């Protein structure tokens, strides 16, 4: 259970996915999770659950509410997943709903963690806020950015200041496509300049894995 969404996945003993669900948590994830658990058992009536693990911002809340077997720290969950798909991963970037995390991997372990500043600028809720303000669903809004011909330079400031920049861009006649692309570029800039702060690409590593729902939109 993350800051803005809830994700559930059921895998079998061969790590094959049997069921997945991804949805906004609406500020109260427990009823949504309960609904999905009931649906899982309805679709797989003979299902024998070996164990249940929770992670994310709602790790302890969900674990205690549903008496789950294990709780896994989010950073370890990110690393474990990345290593499963790329055993020699040496850098992980996660952009979630309200935070951004980067992990440096050395000798098979997390050696350093970089976090965004207190402001949630550059995360999923950042894009969603502007999409809704402009009257668009976030998926459609992000897709419009693919048709930009002159992305607006919005920098990498916090949401409050970015809002004034977007309004000014609209007054200057910028299209929705160019505003969308500009906001997506600002997410990338935020990661590079305020979180990673690498002086060269080589500092990131050679095997990089990206995670988090925001990557669907940038």
Describe the role of every protein-language-model region.
Residues 22-25, 41-75, 104, 111-112:
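Short beta-strand-loop/turn "lid" adjacent to the catalytic site in phosphate-handling enzymes
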Residues 58, 186, 199-218:
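Glycine-rich phosphate-binding loops at beta-strand->alpha-helix junctions
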Residues 37-50, 191-204:
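Phosphate/pyrophosphate-binding loops at sites that engage ATP/ADP/AMP, CoA/4′-phosphopantetheine
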Residues 164-194:
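Adenine-nucleotide phosphate-binding core of ATP-dependent small-molecule kinases
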Residues 1-39, 112-113, 117-119:
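Short glycine-rich, Thr/Ser-proximal phosphate-binding strand/loop in the N-terminal lobe
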Residues 1-14, 89-106:
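Gly/Thr-rich phosphate-binding beta-strand-loop-beta motif of the actin/hexokinase/Hsp70
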Residues 28-29, 107-150:
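Glycine-rich phosphate-binding loop plus the immediately following alpha-helix
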């Amino acid at each position: 259970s993350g800051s803005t969404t809830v994700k559930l996945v059921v895998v079998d003993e061969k790590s094959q996915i049997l069921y997945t669900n991804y949805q906004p948590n609406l500020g109260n994830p427990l009823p949504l999770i309960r609904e999905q658990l009931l649906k899982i058992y309805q679709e797989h009536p003979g299902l024998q659950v070996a164990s249940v693990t929770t992670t994310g911002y709602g790790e302890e809340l969900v674990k205690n509410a549903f008496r789950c077997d294990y709780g896994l720290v989010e950073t370890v969950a990110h690393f474990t997943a990345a290593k499963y798909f790329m055993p020699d991963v040496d850098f992980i970037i996660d952009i979630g709903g309200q935070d951004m995390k980067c992990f440096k991997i050395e000798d098979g372990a997390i050696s350093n963690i970089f976090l965004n500043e207190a402001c949630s600028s550059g995360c999923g809720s950042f894009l969603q806020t502007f999409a809704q303000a402009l009257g668009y669903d976030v998926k459609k809004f992000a897709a419009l950015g693919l048709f930009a011909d002159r992305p607006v330079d919005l920098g990498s400031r916090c949401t409050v200041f970015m809002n004034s920049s977007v309004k000014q861009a609209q007054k200057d006649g910028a299209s929705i496509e160019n505003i969308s692309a500009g906001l997506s570029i600002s997410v990338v800039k935020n990661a590079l300049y305020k979180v990673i702060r690498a002086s060269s690409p080589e500092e990131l590593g050679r095997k990089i894995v990206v995670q988090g729902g925001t990557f669907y939109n940038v």
